[in-house]
Amino acid sequence: MERDERPPSGGGGGGGSAGFLEPPAALPPPPRNGFCQDELAELDPSTISVPDDRAEQRTCLICGDRATGLHYGIISCEGCKGFFKRSICNKRVYRCSRDKNCVMSRKQRNRCQYCRLLKCLQMGMNRKAIREDGMPGGRNKSIGPVQISEEEIERIMSGQEFEEEANHWSNHGDSDHSSPGNRASESNQPSPGSTLSSRSVELNGFMAFRDQYMGMSVPPHYQYIPHLFSYSAHSPLLPPQARSLDPQSYSLIHQLVSAEDLEPLGTPMLIEDGYAVTQAELFALLCRLADELLFRQIAWIKKLPFFCELSIKDYTCLLSSTWQELILLSSLTVYSKQIFGELADVTAKYSPSDEELHRFSDEGMEVIERLIYLYHKFHQLKVSNEEYACMKAINFLNQDIRGLTSASQLEQLNKRYWYICQDFTEYKYTHQPNRFPDLMMCLPEIRYIAGKMVNVPLEQLPLLFKVVLHSCKTSVGKE
């Protein structure tokens, strides 16, 4: 996209944009009433059918044996399902006599219980989906895999987590009638105050961004991907087989990609040589970027192939709960060259004060570490536009959000694009059998980071972005 190369005239106006080179045209005006419901209603996309469920054999994500279904959040066999349930119900603490990296296969899975349980946790088995009495019929059947930190996995493997839970319940008795699983499920829902039906969205400048930002609720440590029905990982003993892409899957993916605005961002990020960017100017630029990215998400909704299948109220509710995640996902993928290129050049011209460095929060440090990790993960995967479009739709179609009127319809849509994404990755990346689960496990990390950013004070965002962009750009430049 061409930019006006004329030097900025006059002083820095109210937007704090002195020194930045303006584009030839301003961004389109924001909608006046939430998501422009009149414009949304005028669209009439064609109705599409749901592809038939595939009956091909699935393999257990833990050992590669024949899977029998979705157990505690992931596709697994009866053996690993029972082992995980017994280990959690009986609070087992195992030991590995080797290096804690034993091979897991159908024949070798019983040789090391420690490594088997470790892999169950790493692949996303949800221990909170097991009933406390150990009887069949676990809690939270709609919840998919969970992603927990290495520290929490270590607490579970060492037994420390079991001891802490026992102490908690002994101290609280029956004062809390909800189970841990129920509390986790409830806390995963956005607060009623975060829905756009109770507060109209304005996209102009800092005030709206701040109100939206501060109004979001923080997700719990466990972040769920709803309805992980079908991702499969091939055992090393079961090499992937050649397959063809279903024509209907290709058509639906093409429609998803067509709904995306893949043009470069229009927010000016060029800056005069030698110009020293202030904290206020960098913050104003970040707000303008957020405004443009959010506007693109609204335009994206109106172009979705399934637009006519949901109500405007549900779209409003979905976007109010996922907009931060959508912006983060797009910044790490389709707009990463600009964000980690042009924006990184701007942040390099910002020098934080000693006071800013001293007051930087622990929450900010955690966000920095996770963002850098996630950037390298996406950089390694080299996510295609097709995969990005599917990941975005899957993350957006979260039927566990409070206030929805068509949760069952959302479940079917989520399932549809889950299968489509798996079809595409297994077809295009035949020799990367773990690519699809690798992509899907990035989604709970995105949700976690987006939720954690709520705890970072707004005045610390310029420093946070400077550190992340500098670290990522420097490390990639060395490759």
Curated annotation (Swiss-Prot):
One of the record's GO molecular function terms: estrogen response element binding
ZnF NR C4-type: positions: 60-80, 96-120
Keywords annotated in UniProt: Developmental protein, Differentiation, DNA-binding, Metal-binding, Nucleus, Receptor, Spermatogenesis, Transcription, Transcription regulation, Zinc, Zinc-finger
Isomerase keyword on record: no
Record field: compositional bias (Basic and acidic residues): 165-177
Cellular localization per UniProt: Nucleus
Top-level taxon: Eukaryota
Residues annotated for Zn(2+) 2 binding in this entry: C96, C102, C112, C115
DNA-binding region: 57-132
Record: residues binding Zn(2+) 1: C60, C63, C77, C80
Subunit and interaction comment: Homodimer. Interacts with UIMC1.
Disulfide bond annotation, renumbered to this chain: none
Xref: InterPro entries: NHR-like_dom_sf (IPR035500), Nucl_hrmn_rcpt_lig-bd (IPR000536), Nuclear_hormone_rcpt_NR3 (IPR050200), Nuclear_hrmn_rcpt (IPR001723), Znf_hrmn_rcpt (IPR001628), Znf_NHR/GATA (IPR013088)
Biased composition (Gly residues): 9-18
Biased composition (Polar residues): 178-198
Annotated source species: Sus scrofa (Pig)
Matches recorded under Pfam families: Hormone_recep, zf-C4
Domain (NR LBD) ranges: 248-479
Family as reported in the entry's similarity comment: Belongs to the nuclear hormone receptor family. NR6 subfamily.
Sufficient for interaction with UIMC1, as annotated region: 172-252
One BP term from GO: spermatogenesis
GO cellular component term of the entry, any: chromatin
Statement: the UniProt record of this protein carries the keyword Acetylation: no
Region (Disordered): 1-32, 131-150, 162-198
Role played: Orphan nuclear receptor that binds to a response element containing the sequence 5'-TCAAGGTCA-3'. Acts as a regulator of embryonic stem cell pluripotency by mediating repression of POU5F1/OCT4: binds to the DR0 element within the POU5F1/OCT4 promoter and inhibits POU5F1/OCT4 expression during embryonic stem cell differentiation. Involved in the regulation of gene expression in germ cell development during gametogenesis.
Listed name of the protein: Nuclear receptor subfamily 6 group A member 1
